[in-house]
């Protein structure tokens, strides 16, 4: 399986790895088929700008690379702008992914949406965007 230089760079040197304590939004998604689990943390200011974004991913190299790239693509943008992130944009930013790894980019998109949904829930804003519920991991009680 051939990976682009960007995929390898984001796998070997992932950006924004870690957790944000008291994050305004936290999203967890997973895919049983591949075994990948992504957790995304968002720090959001009073103007709805994502000032920091971190992730923890348990999974393959493509899952780590797509998580890393997704954080880079949304940091500094508004929450509304982050919701426009697509898996295709993540793939393009990484200069492509093998077809069998495209699902990792879908998880990265869904992790961002899941974190935004958590933020919206915390501030009482309605969730007015589509969530792929089959990959969203239920909240721990």
For each predicted feature, which ranges?
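Glycine/charged-rich beta-loop-alpha catalytic/anionic-binding loops adjacent to active sites
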Residues: 44-55, 89-93
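Active-site cofactor/substrate anionic-group-binding motifs, chiefly glycine-
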Residues: 49, 58, 73
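Structured beta-strand/loop patches that form or line metal/cofactor-binding pockets in enzymes
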Residues: 17-50
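C-terminal binding/interaction regions
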Residues: 1-27, 77-81, 85-141
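Alpha-helical support elements that line or immediately flank enzyme active sites
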Residues: 62-77
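Helix-adjacent hinge/juxtasegments
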Residues: 42, 51-53, 70, 81
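Short, thiol/selenol-centered motifs that function as redox-active sites or metal-ligating centers
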Residues: 34, 57-65, 104
């Amino acid at each position: 399986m051939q990976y682009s230089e960007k995929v390898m760079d984001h796998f070997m040197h992932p950006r924004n790895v870690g957790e944000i304590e008291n994050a305004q939004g936290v999203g967890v998604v997973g895919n049983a088929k591949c075994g990948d689990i992504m957790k995304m943390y968002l720090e959001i200011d009073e103007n709805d700008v994502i000032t920091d974004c971190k992730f923890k991913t348990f999974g393959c190299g493509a899952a780590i690379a797509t998580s890393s790239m997704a954080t880079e693509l949304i940091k500094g943008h508004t929450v509304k702008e982050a919701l426009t992130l697509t898996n295709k944009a993540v793939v393009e930013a990484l200069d492509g992914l093998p077809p069998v790894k495209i699902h990792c980019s879908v998880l990265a998109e869904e992790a961002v949406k899941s974190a935004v949904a958590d933020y919206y829930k915390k501030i009482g804003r309605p969730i007015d965007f589509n969530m792929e519920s089959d990959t969203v991991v239920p909240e721990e009680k």
